[in-house]
Regions:
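Short linear motifs in intrinsically disordered
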Residues: 13-15, 46-49
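Conserved GNAT-fold acetyl-CoA-binding loop/helix
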Residues: 28-48
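A short helix-loop-beta-strand connector motif used in the catalytic cores of GNAT acetyltransferases and
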Residues: 47-60, 67-69
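Short, charged/polar low-complexity linear motifs in solvent-exposed/disordered segments
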Residues: 37-39, 48-50, 85-88, 131
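Acyl-donor (CoA/ACP) binding surface of acyl/acetyltransferases
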Residues: 1-31, 60-190
């Protein structure tokens, strides 16, 4: 569990299903369309799946206990790591992504949560590099990446498709990649 001034970042519980449904029944960004939930039963199943995966952090408001979103932290190259000197695996690169209930946008919660998770990854998990993808139309997420000290590494044209047009053909999106190294994070004014 990670705590900030206003938030608790913690594993999901079954009791989070209603809040999960609230922000995933109509995702605003295409990359989350495959996570769309259509019923409370699906929300309960998804809450259990998130409970069983330590890559998910529920973003809970300290003062109300409401879950307003999540941060998912994917270890890069999962399953493809090179063995370390002791015969185990090490991974020093992570790809965080975040989604918040639209009613809580613009209040600094995404920054507060991501900042705390970045600090955790760099200082507790030994991360060397973090990177994030954001669609070219998602200006708020681009600004968040920049506020977190990330630099834009590139723009991938027609990189991925999450939706189809009326004929069933994929609509490809342009995607920015942002990244930050541990040594850059250490110099950031947090």
């Amino acid at each position: 569990m990670i705590t900030t001034e206003r938030l608790i970042l913690r594993p999901f519980t079954e009791n989070d299903a209603a809040d999960l449904f609230e922000y995933l029944h109509e995702p605003m960004v295409h990359c989350f369309f495959d996570m769309k939930i259509s019923s409370m039963d699906e929300a309960k199943e998804d809450a259990v799946k998130r409970m069983e995966n330590d890559c998910y952090f529920a973003i809970e408001l300290k003062d109300t206990g409401k879950v307003i979103g999540e941060i998912f932290v994917h270890p890069d190259g999962e399953g493809m790591e090179e063995e370390d000197s002791e015969g185990g695996y090490s991974d020093d690169t992570y790809s965080p992504c975040w989604i918040l209930n639209k009613d809580y946008h613009g209040k600094g919660y995404a920054y507060e949560a991501a900042n705390a998770v970045f600090d955790y990854l760099f200082n507790e998990k030994g991360a060397r590099r973090l990177y994030a993808y954001t669609e070219d139309y998602n200006i708020a997420s681009q600004k968040l990446c920049e506020k977190l000290g990330m630099r834009q590494e590139g723009l991938f044209m027609e990189f991925i498709s999450f939706v189809n047009d009326e004929n069933g053909d994929p609509i490809y999106e342009n995607t920015y990649q942002y990244a930050i190294l541990k040594k850059e994070w250490d110099k950031c004014d947090k």
